[in-house]
Amino acid sequence: MRDPIEWPTTDLVTHRVSATPDRTATVAVGGDETTYRELDAAVGAVAAALDRRTDSTDPTVAVLLPTRPEVGTLLFAAMRLGATLAPLNVELDAATLRAQCATVEADLLVCAASTRDLAAEAATCPVVSVEDLPVQPDGAGADRETEVTPATLSRTDTQLVVFTSGTTSEPKGVRLTVGNLVASAVASSYRLGVLPTDRWLVCLPTYHMGGLAPFVRSALYGTAVVVQRSFDADATRQAIAEYGVTGVSLVPTMLSRLLDAGWEPPSSLRFVLLGGGPASEPLVERCRERGVPVCPTYGMTETASQIATARPETAFEHAGTVGQPLVFTDVTVVADGEPCDPGERGEIVVDGPTVTPGYLGGAGASFGEFGFRTGDLGYRDADGRLWVEGRVDDRIVTGGENVDASTVAGVIRDHSAVEDAAVVGLPDEEWGQRVAALVVGDVTPAAVREHGAERLAAYEVPKTVRTADALPRTPSGTVDREAVRSRLSAGDSGTERPE
């Protein structure tokens, strides 16, 4: 494991503006462009405004904003002030948000006009609207206070608290340090490459790392972030073309919708970073046929985003891989406490400078001899490429037999009429658990079981099959397995239940 140098010493915009002040920093789709000189002025003014509104010497600023450029301004203002930023999910209910504000011990909650009422109900601290902060580079907004002296940073300082998606459990507040963020940005750019003219489109929520990471990468390298407030297949493909976008982060559902809409990527697009869930082989093949430079990636909040990423040529040549681990990142596949040989499946364990120091609020991170235990199952080949095959706790034990949920889901997805599938175990009085599948596509439960019987052992074939218009997902795009389990248990999809 190798660490990058002990840097930065102050916020990234302070460093960046001294090098390339007139380069474009942010672009709002349908709005204005901002240079790094202008962003630096806004960051300084906002940092002073936050300082005036908080009493703590190391405050935590919670943010309840939809995706917009001001999230980046607030991130760097917090960094300049020496504060911690805690972006909150605007889709959550007030009670959950109140609990998260308490967990992070927020000193101030920044909202938008669209989230003002929710913020007032959820807040455990004073609330200020972003419209009342000097976020605009031209001075629009509230009075501009005297700028603060940039805080001296250490790589161990907690910069962000980001809550997990809650795919398999309650969301946990992940501490991410200055060093975590910079190491992640360096490693990502080392794998993908970076050009001075790069423009990265952000259309993912900025309360998850997929939406936040491009701001850090761009400030580090002096490139631009193009911000779209929400994903829409037609509007997003138009933005990619109109704004000269060279990279974009998407989840599989978004990419599928773009392709379904007939999208042909422009030659300027160099990377489609695809994460938040498994990239199916048919989806990657569609990308190859359309000339989409897809980069399947594996990452998590606890590692400040990417762990491993496949470049397009690797993704096309080695079906299902997420590529080799990024620079600085050590990945060990472990079974029974020992590293696995190539091709042997086990739990994916990650170590390196991108890994969180831990969670807030007493939630324990699982660290072992080889690093952070992700809870994900996978394997590596002899060249170090990684495949991710589901969760350790996705194992279903039915009648004493072990069933791998991801394997069953993969077989179901191979059916020509199936668009997507999720498989979980449901309680069963006779067998302990039974295999259950929620399926998206124009297919009957009987056809799914018949297809499964041709490729799976009898105990692996789903006994419960329901269809749905879409799989329930968390805001970050990952399958919400608890919601899948609830839907299969309750039968709320309105489709038949097998005998």
Model-derived features: positions:
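Conserved pre-ATP/AMP-binding loop-to-beta segment of ANL
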Residues: 4-9, 21-24, 143-163, 168-172, ...
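Conserved AMP-binding/adenylate-forming core of the ANL superfamily
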Residues: 5-9, 22-54, 62-68, 72, ...
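Conserved AMP-binding A3 loop
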Residues: 33-37, 152, 156-186, 480
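Conserved ATP-dependent adenylate/AMP-binding module captured primarily in the ANL superfamily
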Residues: 92-121, 135-137, 184-201, 232-246
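ANL superfamily adenylate-forming
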Residues: 114-156, 170
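Conserved AMP-binding/adenylation subdomain of ANL enzymes
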Residues: 184-199, 206-247, 252, 257-262
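Conserved AMP-binding/adenylate-forming
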Residues: 270-271, 279-295, 302-386, 392-395, ...
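AMP-binding/adenylate-forming catalytic core of the ANL superfamily
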Residues: 352, 357-358, 377-460, 470, ...
